[in-house]
Amino acid sequence: MRTGIIAQKIGMTSVFNDKGERISLTLVKVDDCQVVGHKTLEKHGYNALVIGVKDKKISRVTKPMRQVFANAKISPKTKLKEFRISEENFIDIAASLEVDHFTAGQFVDITATTIGKGFAGSMKRHNFRGLEASHGVSISHRSHGSTGQRQDPGKVFKGKKMAGHMGCNQVTIQNLKIFAVDKERKLIMIQGSIPGHKNSYLSVKDAIKKISITV
């Protein structure tokens, strides 16, 4: 199991293949991605690499983290993330990870934070159909309706689908295919859409459920 990388979502575009089919692509940029530290089975109970991306002002880093970056002999990073790895896949601290960590035709899993939608109603948040448009219904056309039973149990159960904050959730999209890798511009072109807004950070790692590589 190899390490993943931290990338930045640039936006979307599309291309046409040899059959004239239009393929939607999401562009992600890999820049300044370095190994910050190691987690070992003997010391921490598991094997992992700590990856960092995007340089940060030293004045904005806490003293404990300053020592971490000083030990790694690299500049402070804005984003840090751990990736579990197998024992034979350790990479030297301060080593850089580039776009050629992946190849065209490979399948990857993307973990990102969805776009925040604020407080949303039940129809938008959970795809409820709403109440009737007429036949005695007034004001509450977009209401979720009843949320419980009667005096017993006398409460709304946890997890009940209701209106509330929507978005800003960490989600993983599995088995997305890499269309192409542009080493010169440090871009990875991934087929399909990826959660998150432009310039947001996401993690890219080898697909767990789809090992085969088809070009």
From Swiss-Prot:
Lineage of the organism: Bacteria, Pseudomonadati, Pseudomonadota, Alphaproteobacteria, Rickettsiales
UniProt keyword list: Methylation, Ribonucleoprotein, Ribosomal protein, RNA-binding, rRNA-binding
HAMAP family in UniProt: Ribosomal_uL3_B
Family: Belongs to the universal ribosomal protein uL3 family.
InterPro entries: Ribosomal_uL3, Ribosomal_uL3_bac/org-type, Ribosomal_uL3_CS, Transl_B-barrel_sf
Assembly notes: Part of the 50S ribosomal subunit. Forms a cluster with proteins L14 and L19.
SUPFAM superfamilies given in the database record: Translation proteins (SSF50447)
NCBIfam families from the UniProt entry: L3_bact
GO molecular function, one term: structural constituent of ribosome
Recorded coiled-coil stretches: none
Protein name: Large ribosomal subunit protein uL3
Post-translational events: Methylated by PrmB.
Cellular compartments per GO CC: ribonucleoprotein complex; ribosome
Modified residues annotated as N5-methylglutamine in this record: Q151
Region (Disordered): 136-155
Domain of life: Bacteria
Record function comment: One of the primary rRNA binding proteins, it binds directly near the 3'-end of the 23S rRNA, where it nucleates assembly of the 50S subunit.
Species name: Rickettsia rickettsii (strain Sheila Smith)
